[in-house]
């Protein structure tokens, strides 16, 4: 388990690093369940960067700093963990549990029930959330040309 980490609200100087972290993680981790064409489009279109920047401008983006570098990010939007990522080079070190615990803490301070979604094909994320005590809320209805997602819920 990690020994030192800080979860803090992202500031303007963090934005580029957070966008690069997301692109690296999507590129390395999402191809197996989204396919090469979808991942390439999402990264090259700027959609990933736009998603993070849009939430950053609303004050929803938090970063996980460890060993003087940003190793993870989460987006909290209402009672929802909209996005959570650990940089590909820092996965399987316990940082995901640290970031998820802080996100839960922040949301449970305001909401009794919290939620998140993940792609139905993202078996690593599904296993992680279940191991952290999240319950499947069910499969969400997929929109055309959009991969199916699973909702997870947790109650305070």
Q: Which residue stretches match the model-derived regions?
A:
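Conserved N-terminal entry element of GNAT/NAT acetyltransferase domains
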Residues: 1-16, 154-156
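Conserved GNAT-fold acetyl-CoA-binding loop/helix
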Residues: 26-50
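Conserved beta-hairpin
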Residues: 58-72
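A short, internal acetyl-CoA/4′-phosphopantetheine-binding micro-motif in the GNAT/acyltransferase core
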Residues: 81-92, 119
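Conserved acetyl-CoA pyrophosphate-binding loop and the N-cap/start of the following alpha-helix
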Residues: 90, 94-102
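Conserved GNAT acetyl-CoA-binding A-motif
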Residues: 107-118
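Conserved beta-strand-loop-alpha-helix junction that forms the acyl-donor binding cleft
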Residues: 116-126, 142-148
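Conserved active-site tyrosine of GNAT-family acetyltransferases
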Residues: 129, 134
């Amino acid at each position: 388990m990690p020994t030192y980490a800080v979860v803090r609200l992202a500031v303007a100087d963090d934005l580029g690093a957070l966008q690069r972290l997301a692109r690296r993680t999507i590129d390395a981790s999402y191809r197996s369940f989204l396919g090469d064409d979808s991942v390439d489009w999402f990264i090259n279109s700027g959609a990933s960067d736009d998603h993070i920047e849009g939430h950053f401008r609303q004050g929803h983006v938090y970063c996980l700093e460890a060993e003087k570098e940003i190793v993870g990010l989460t987006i909290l939007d209402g009672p929802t963990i909209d996005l959570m990522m650990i940089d590909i080079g820092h996965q399987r070190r316990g940082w995901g549990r640290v970031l998820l615990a802080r996100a839960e803490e922040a949301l449970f301070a305001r909401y009794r029930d919290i939620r998140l979604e993940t792609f139905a094909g993202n078996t690593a994320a599904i296993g992680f959330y279940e191991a952290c005590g999240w319950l499947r809320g069910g499969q969400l209805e997929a929109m055309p040309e959009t991969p199916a997602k699973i909702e997870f819920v947790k109650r305070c």
